[in-house]
């Protein structure tokens, strides 16, 4: 009926606007990082993770109060407008952005830097595994690990908590060890974490496995965005558009692909296969390490 059509249209528009805001926000973050003179991109993504936690808590509060959904949505809309209105005046304006990128060559598909596609590939792998934790960790615990009801979401909480903490820690590691080394460690943590959870489907090792995955996925995407924005061969906004578009495709296809693999082979084998994406991150980072520094 018309209400479902309107809702579908609204969700499509919401998704498009959310992605545009993602690109704009990360472009601003790259420009701030350049001006700041040190690695801070992962901390920005850490605040995004805190926003997700806050949204979940607020949603749970509204659900428990049984208030109408229009009150819920209206309150969030008003809060969002307030935050945007306050933050807007602190944004880097177009003139400042152009000054920062005045020496950047004009964009051309013929001269596009191949490293952007490799960064996108690593971002794709990271977001594929992030989507797996979001959508399948609780299913894995309920159907494979089978702990007490109170611990069904242990893997999800461990993974998301580690991802948030890891993002606030990552900038210091990138500064000290370089982005290539950190990406290789991230890939190893994803690989080892998912294999641990698949090999030992018991409460403690499976929870530890998803904890390691959370630390692994925490920094992979922010580092890729940061490198893309600082390449100097292309405008930061265009670089992040390319990398984020490839990356978010992993978030889109990851959960259904895991579902298809789980139906065909079982969930333990499915997440074991997904773990190989961590190996891919480490391999690509090792191959192009000099370009990432």
Feature roles, as predicted:
Residues 42-44, 146-159, 238-242:
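Loop-to-transmembrane helix entry
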Residues 135-151:
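Short amphipathic helix-loop junctions that connect adjacent transmembrane helices
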Residues 63, 166-179, 262-263:
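Helix-to-loop junctions at the C-terminal end of transmembrane segments
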Residues 12, 113-129, 211-215:
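Pair of pore-lining "gating" transmembrane helices in MFS-fold secondary transporters
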